[in-house]
């Protein structure tokens, strides 16, 4: 290696400084990797390269890491800071032998046998000049920009054309002390370490670039040869009384409508545009859990991203985040309604494949789509689809659509060798661009068809949207899931591959529910969602600022002390900084008088702000239910609280996709927290501390409308136990409308017919419908629900039910 202060290297570094723009993965190696700044460190690279080391030098300087040009001094010995697996590839002739680098490994290991206290950290570093995966059919471009083993001339061409798209990826540090203690220090271990390192670099490249891209027409030709599509073409020909060739042309049209046409060039251009867009829209994007997903990719998993659907921005945000986190943007299942010019062609080139809202029994379309999805999985492309099927208008997760999940499981059953893993993703925003439109649609206005004019209209309204949130939830390995649901599934399929197993549909439904549960398990309690939650629980949607800040501090402490799950995230800062942030976004109104400052929700947008509250209401459901018990019982013991929570939790779980493994333990942790915070006194019998009564009342109010719904349902069941599901749903909806009109309830979800359908399904499952067996339980839950309501609301419900069904 040339000396770092040589004229050549100084000139090279100066040139690269102007030509190269580098993105580091992960963004903070000290934070995200187990690098210990107190221990000696050596970088491991795949190929010796002057330009790569120059680029690495710029990065290490910025992070305060040792320079690759600075040798490691150990007890009088000088060791190179960089160890490479391969020498430089000359323009002509063979590459330099790797023996020199193997000797470096051996010498590093042997140092540990001589010095028991020594622990050198070996940090693998990968550099990528551009991220083109290449085509399955080789081309001149691939020859010129050969990225795996470039000569110095090819490397200069890569820097010239792709220098603005340089990625440097650091991996977890490997302890050579651990290697030496566990495996020894001889040359055999150095050989093994070299082999492992080669596999690591090969996998890292695939994670960063993805599999090679197929020629689109060659892909179509391959798919048309599949048995399922050939059979569907023959059936189409027979059923529609057209020629086989005509049916084949229809299949090609379907493929052309569906298939993505991924372009790395467009992705690079889009990356520049999206960087500008995010910087204009958002003050930051908060990411949690990306490292676990990167590891799944590295371990060879087929990844299927299943995010919640808040906004059309979701398509762009997740792909952008994955790109910057060193992973390939997925192929995204987009609704056919988005296939309009110019967005459709751009989405398609960015990896979108289009799906119709309904297959309408079209067997040929179904066969083509399934085979295309199978091909994506078989070739190793990451896939993304929205299990809700559409954007939520209320801020709550929608009931999942199971079609894509069923096709994914079918692909596993058809014999994908790699593990297939679903990665739930929570997407959140301080401002959703379409939220005002959602309010209009919920009020009865017809949904507008997507068009280029809507895009221009949205761009015109761009402003300060605060922050975005991308949290990756608990992954679901499909092979493991199937092993749990049907341990003999492989044997069953081997006996009769064409027979749909009896366990298939129940398993798909369970999987869909688990996906939604894991999405909510990764929720982000942000400044806007928390403030909306507090203010909408207050009378007139307004609080004195210091009171609001205290309530926010309480919720922040609760969510951090008793975390909902390890995947959820909580806003940084305190109540004051959160209120300041929300006011800077013009989300709330600040009014000052002689006494102080009042923060409120503008009555014109109160319904709109319920959208943000609903994003995280499940996080506070149990604390709020516990607070409600404490408010409505003069003295409330631990046993009573447990009993009431266990009565309502099955309904809360079904309605809010909640995921608490040990509910009694979670309840105890919340009670202990409330005692520690001084809100309550007692250890088994609790009373609210008088000076904290307002905080407990506000907390209890969060779930009040939910309890009102349950009171409606159980009062109906108590007075008429033989109600059918359809009758219960109809009458519950009718009484909810009446209650809302009398008591000013405006939240859209309060009147949502689909919500009452979800609850009726759960009640049927629990045995509470059309059965006298559980009548005592129904009466008990009705009494508990009534007790947790204000006297006026309770009386309205009781009187209305008796008027409707009284004898």
Swiss-Prot record:
Tell me one GO molecular function of this protein. glycerol-3-phosphate O-acyltransferase activity
Enzyme Commission number, as recorded: 2.3.1.15
Give the metabolic or biological pathway.
Phospholipid metabolism; CDP-diacylglycerol biosynthesis; CDP-diacylglycerol from sn-glycerol 3-phosphate: step 1/3
Q: What is its main location?
A: membrane
Single biological process term from Gene Ontology: CDP-diacylglycerol biosynthetic process
Q: Which GO terms describe its cellular component?
A: plasma membrane
Any keyword Ribonucleoprotein? no
Q: Where is this motif: HXXXXD motif?
A: 308-313
Which cell locations does it reside in?
Answer: Cell inner membrane
The entry assigns this protein to a family as follows: Belongs to the GPAT/DAPAT family.
What UniProt notes about the protein's domains is: The HXXXXD motif is essential for acyltransferase activity and may constitute the binding site for the phosphate moiety of the glycerol-3-phosphate.
Q: Could you tell me what this protein is called?
A: Glycerol-3-phosphate acyltransferase
- Organism field: Shewanella frigidimarina (strain NCIMB 400)
